[in-house]
UniProtKB/Swiss-Prot annotation:
Protein name per Swiss-Prot or TrEMBL: E1B protein, small T-antigen homolog
Protein family (similarity comment): Belongs to the adenoviridae E1B 19 kDa protein family.
Natural source organism: Tree shrew adenovirus serotype 1
GO biological process, one term: symbiont-mediated suppression of host apoptosis
Swiss-Prot/TrEMBL keywords: Early protein, Host-virus interaction, Inhibition of host apoptosis by viral BCL2-like protein, Modulation of host cell apoptosis by virus
Length: 137
């Protein structure tokens, strides 16, 4: 699960998510990392499917302050392959954007609220994929 290694650093994860959002300029996406462009294009091309996959009233619930909905989303994210990582981060970016549009709370704070539990899940997934320590120590 080497593809997860960079995302185990919170700073990298946040940079990619913010870079793939509408908060970022076209120029910064163009000159940014390829993964940011991939997540952005996945988010744009699958927007309707992502929104349809959310339970009815999910975004309105988040906007009204029901933070238990964050856990509901993070539980569904799958970081076990590079493709699933891309799809999960694309969905995460879209949810932050939609939530921000419905809320009076800043995009940065909403990003932090969603990213910390997702980051913890990425770390847990990366640890699950590691080989057990050798008994030859």
């Amino acid at each position: 699960m080497d593809f997860l290694k960079p995302f185990c650093q919170y700073k990298v994860l946040k940079s990619v998510v913010v870079g793939a959002s509408n908060q970022s300029s076209v120029v910064s996406r163009f000159f940014g990392p390829k993964i940011t462009k991939l997540i952005y294009s996945t988010k744009v091309s699958n927007r309707d499917q992502f929104l349809d996959s959310l339970p009815r009233g999910y975004l309105d619930g988040l906007a009204s302050g029901d933070f238990s909905k964050i856990d509901l989303l993070v539980e569904q994210l799958d970081f076990t392959s590079a493709g699933r990582l891309t799809a999960s981060l694309s969905l995460l970016v879209l949810v932050v954007e939609e939530w921000s549009a419905r809320s009076c709370v800043s995009f940065d704070i909403l990003t932090e609220l969603l990213l910390v539990p997702a980051w913890r899940k990425i770390i847990a997934t990366a640890w699950k994929g590691r080989a057990p320590p050798s008994a030859d120590v």
